[in-house]
Design a protein with these regions (language model features):
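Membrane-embedded alpha-helical segments that form the functional core of polytopic membrane enzymes
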Residues: 44-100, 117, 141-150
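Hydrophobic, membrane-inserted alpha-helices
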Residues: 31-33, 53-59, 115-119, 144, ...
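Basic, amphipathic juxtamembrane/active-site segments
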Residues: 75, 88-131, 135
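Alpha-helical transmembrane segments
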Residues: 131-166
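Select subsegments of transmembrane alpha-helices in polytopic membrane proteins
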Residues: 44-49, 105-113, 258-267
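Helix-coil boundary and interhelical linker segments in multi-pass alpha-helical membrane proteins
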Residues: 59-72, 119-144, 277-286
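C-terminal membrane-associated helical module and adjoining short loops/tails
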Residues: 1-29, 151, 161-317
Length: 317
């Protein structure tokens, strides 16, 4: 029988892409929940749905300005995140993976933050802008739109894309969820019209993949050349020495960028949100999203594209 430590390690995607806080806090708690729910026969999708309601509940609490409502919001969002970790760990450990699960998993975090942004705007719109006698009013809604749609969403999607790229070169196709828009569009086109749910998913997922590809032209050029020499299904340990060297060099160059992908996902946002809500200055969170995380995003993107340009030259030579 596997020990808890062995099961925890098996539930990780890779040590390179797991954040310190997740490894030592979120994932162990998530695994305890996963084992508990699995023993009761609860499906991972139910846990994902629970996380959505917990995230919406957290948003409701963040609407209020008093300390205890905000403490409750912190606790609810932490439990939503534990559930989000739990469903993925359960799916990986038990093999209970479904299309509905993929939809819910991608949907849940978006629902949390959509609700949170609305709650923060409703909370602040009648408050005064610090140092002035002017209410935030529509200004806070404009900040939330910029933070959520133009910053948060593209940052998180590109960070996820870079993680999946890293996992592909580290563990091969089987250890990654690196998809491309053409394949997803082909799946959509192949589905009969009565399978409307699957068609809706693959149509939107193809668009999501396309948005990632448009922002990474140098990676697309490098990856196209890489697949010419490696083949679509090459796996680590079952490839030529030349391909193995390219794979190893890419992983070596990509590994330092994983800290940026981690900073652009949940934990850094959540910690900033917790602190600013508890201190009753959640507008700082929106500025953190727009200014600090955008700088990290631009830096990460620039370095990754430079890495891909270097790797492309290595392939050509």
């Amino acid at each position: 029988m596997s020990t808890f430590k062995e099961m925890l390690q098996a539930s990780f995607k890779s040590n390179d892409t797991e954040e310190w806080l997740d490894v030592h806090f979120t994932r162990p708690i998530g695994l305890v929940f996963a084992l508990f729910w699995n023993k009761l026969g609860v499906h991972p999708n139910v846990i994902t749905i629970l996380s959505i309601f917990l995230g919406i509940g957290a948003a409701y609490m963040f609407y209020y300005t008093d300390l205890w409502h905000n403490v409750a919001g912190v606790v609810l969002l932490m439990f939503a995140n534990f559930c989000d970790s739990t469903d993925g760990q359960m799916a990986r450990l038990t093999g209970k993976k479904t299309l509905v699960g993929r939809v819910l998993d991608g949907f849940s975090g978006d629902v949390w933050f959509f609700a949170i942004y609305i709650a923060l705007c409703l909370r602040m719109m009648y408050q005064y802008i610090p140092g002035t006698a002017v209410h935030w009013g529509l200004i806070i809604w404009a900040l939330a739109v910029v933070a959520g749609i133009f910053c948060h969403s593209p940052q998180a999607s590109l960070a996820d894309y870079y993680r999946q790229i890293h996992l592909f070169f580290l563990k091969g196709k089987a250890g990654s969820e690196l998809d491309n828009s053409d394949q997803q569009r082909a799946i959509y086109d192949s589905l009969p019209k009565h399978k409307w749910f699957a068609r809706l998913f693959y149509f939107n997922y193809a668009k999501y993949c396309k948005s990632q590809e448009k922002r990474t032209p140098r990676f697309q050029a490098f990856f196209k050349e890489y697949l010419k020499i490696s083949g679509e299904d090459a796996e680590p340990g079952n490839e030529s020495l030349a391909v193995s060297k390219v794979r190893a060099d890419f992983v070596e160059g990509s590994r330092p960028l994983m800290k940026y992908t981690n900073l652009l996902t949940f934990n850094s946002r959540a910690i900033c949100l917790y602190i600013t809500c508890l201190l009753n200055c959640p507008w700082v969170y929106l500025l953190f999203e727009i200014l600090v995380l955008t700088v990290l995003y631009v830096h990460m993107h620039s370095r990754h594209e430079h890495l891909c340009e270097t790797m492309l030259e290595e392939l050509k030579n």
